[in-house]
UniProtKB/Swiss-Prot annotation:
Organism of this sequence: Cryptococcus neoformans var. neoformans serotype D (strain JEC21 / ATCC MYA-565) (Filobasidiella neoformans)
A GO molecular-function descriptor: RNA binding
InterPro entries for this protein: TRM6 (IPR017423)
Gene designation per UniProt: TRM6
Protein name, as recorded: tRNA (adenine(58)-N(1))-methyltransferase non-catalytic subunit TRM6
Family stated for the protein in its record: Belongs to the TRM6/GCD10 family.
Comp. bias intervals (Polar residues): 1-20, 128-147
Nucleus listed as a keyword: yes
Entry annotated with the keyword Mitochondrion: no
Function, in words: Substrate-binding subunit of tRNA (adenine-N(1)-)-methyltransferase, which catalyzes the formation of N(1)-methyladenine at position 58 (m1A58) in initiator methionyl-tRNA.
Any one biological process term the GO annotation gives: tRNA methylation
Region (Disordered): 1-61, 128-171, 510-560
UniProt keywords, alphabetically: Nucleus, RNA-binding, tRNA processing
Amino acid sequence: MTEKQQNSQQPSQLDSTASISALPPQLQQPAAGITGAPGNAEATTSEPPSTKRPRKAIESSEPLTEVILRRLTTIKEGDTVLLRLPSDLVKSVVVQGDNLVQLGKYGAFPASQLIGLHYDITYEIVSSSGSGASTPQPQSLDFSTEETQSKKGNKKNKNKGKDTAAVSKNNPGWNNILRPLKRQLVVDAVIDDIVETNEFIEDLSETEKTTLSHDEIAELRAQGCTPEEIIQAQIARHEKFGLKTDFSKEKWRRRKEKKFYQTVQPLAPSIPNVLYHYNLRSPQSILHLRDDTLSQLLTMANVRPGGRYLVVDDTGGLITAAVLERMGSEGSILLFNESDSPPAWGILQTMNFSDRELEPIKWLNWLEAEEEYQKPAPPVQAEPPTNPIKAAAKQRKYAAQVAELNNTRNELHLGGWDGLILATTLNPISVVARLTPYLLGSAPIVVYSPYYQVLAELLSWSKKDPNYLNDTLTESWERTYQVLPGRTHPMMTTSATGGYLWNATRVHPSQFQPESHQRFKRRKTGKAPGKEQLSSVAKDEEAVNESLEIDPEELANEGE
């Protein structure tokens, strides 16, 4: 029997309604292995963990949709921006006007150049003198090397790729600017019209090639030639370029563009872009969660605006950010944490949610979630305080924290939550069993794990519990295909698995047991489960009949 039916939503893709602004001090905790790692323009400063709970944002008359739209479209100072490089790698930088963004061989530019620009537009790094080419950084700062360093290498080279006072003063990157890149049209050839083939192209060694050498390319850069002019010079020196097919020419050209162009593309702070960045840099910090699995998780959990969800998140805030983005910051999210400090919401910082957008999020640690828990009183001072005003302020602060904690606990214990989402390293059986009583009937429950065995045990346990209906274990799978005219093949570097999902529907089991169930149990066990009950009922009936029997002699005596 269920109490409530929910209108399920089936979005085909992850929503991209995200935005950018500063986080409150309580949330400024970088995720492990991401913020401040080599390759960032600078280390993100954060305050030490605080036991204070985030206060409610100040009411604003501006529509929330306008806040989200502005965050999603325009870069502001203080934002964390993901820059896509020509090598398809992604670098996270913090936009501050007095910093220099260094990208190794892809050049450098002042961070202030990003302020006011729009996302998802490719910009070229050029010199402000009008020469059309920027000065590349030393090869030791090559970003492609930074991206493949191990954790030990990150510790040894923690200052690598960051701004220092000596570099910032003399770096020619301060003279560079960003301007939108004008690309040439992609070759749109028809299969039937192709005359050229690769039949007469021979593989030559490096010494036999007639293309520009490294020294000649460096000389052209020193003369101020643009990347397009360098590519045209390469084409002019390529003897057999005309023998290539149109597709080979385009592939060759794009390969040279990645080599010579100095471009950046600011990526909008949406869940797909953030997920792509974290899968490249630190997939273990998000439990190897993939975009297709995340979209399935949000769909199974029926996440919608105005919903109320319990979330256990060990992915650095990825699940929380995805739920908050899908909700449009309308509803309520209650997180559970193992420590007394707020969770490490590094991805929320990368998403640059504003105070107003983070207002639906509340959190409790597992001890505070107990119904019998009471917050201990502050220690009593043996001596009277020297400053009564300061002591009174501390008492008011403590009372406000206790009141906010009690409100959050009451909200949990009153129940009525619309769903439960887990992506944690904890035992899912204990977590699901503990939080299920607070869910509404028909509320979906979704658990993610990168390991099959963990969810297999959960499935075996839930099959025996009448509180869970239609519990299933699924695995999502996707593969990227390269589609060209007349040819299609999959990309061979696709990950093997995207993890596993267990989902079920919360129901309230009925105490009524139909007679058909009793007969089925009797056939299955070979016993008559109702014999004792029937014998007791028969005895009761005999007692009632005896009490109702009338003695004829007593009746005659009463008549006399």
